[in-house]
Amino acid sequence: MQPRVPSAAGYGVDAEEIARRYEGVAFEVVHEEFLPWLPPGPGRVVDIGAGSGRDAAALAARGYQVVAVEPTPHLRRIGQRLHADAAIDWIDDALPSLTGLRGTFDFVLLSAVWMHLDEPERVDAMRRLAELVVPGGHVALSLRHGPVPAGRRMFAVSAVETVALAERFGLSAVHRGHGSDCLSREDVGWSTLVFRPEPPTIAGVSR
């Protein structure tokens, strides 16, 4: 039996170069489609798979209380160094279980993370995301499509499959988009998805 490859495999080897590329593109450019779904006022936000901290720092600058989850030690240290002045709570944790992450959040961001999980992990992770987001909050997810870089662990996951899985755990898609790669890789494309918890029902009647 082959040993299990961690979902974040490959990111520690070239962490400095990866961070340089991430930091070279602004949060507002990469996540333009997510901007309308950010909380309207101060709230709790978690960036799962925070990488170099670019997104977490941008969210903190908007006044949110931000938790950055990053399992790769090299990237986490780089993020803490680059954004030392930002009000970010960094934690060492990973999907699918996120055992160290406490509380609930108004906005849950997963940027270029979901395709690193295999099918059983995606089921467990979606269940956990549904637990983390508050009623009226949003889960924003970007999904990479394209060839797998050497040394990385990625799976072919469609937006349709992801939406169907989210629905199993009470998360409805309120936004679906598809776009090109911000780093100008011609063979890479992205799906953008935003989910919201479905309202509770009583005797089959929504309220």
Residue ranges with predicted function:
Residues 131:
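Short, conserved loop/helix-junction motifs that constitute active-site signature segments
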Residues 106:
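Conserved acidic residues
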Residues 112-113:
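Short catalytic micro-motifs in class I SAM-dependent methyltransferases
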Residues 1-46, 51-103, 117-124, 128, ...:
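Class I (Rossmann-like) S-adenosyl-L-methionine-dependent methyltransferase catalytic domain
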Residues 109:
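A conserved beta-strand element that flanks and buttresses the S-adenosyl-L-methionine
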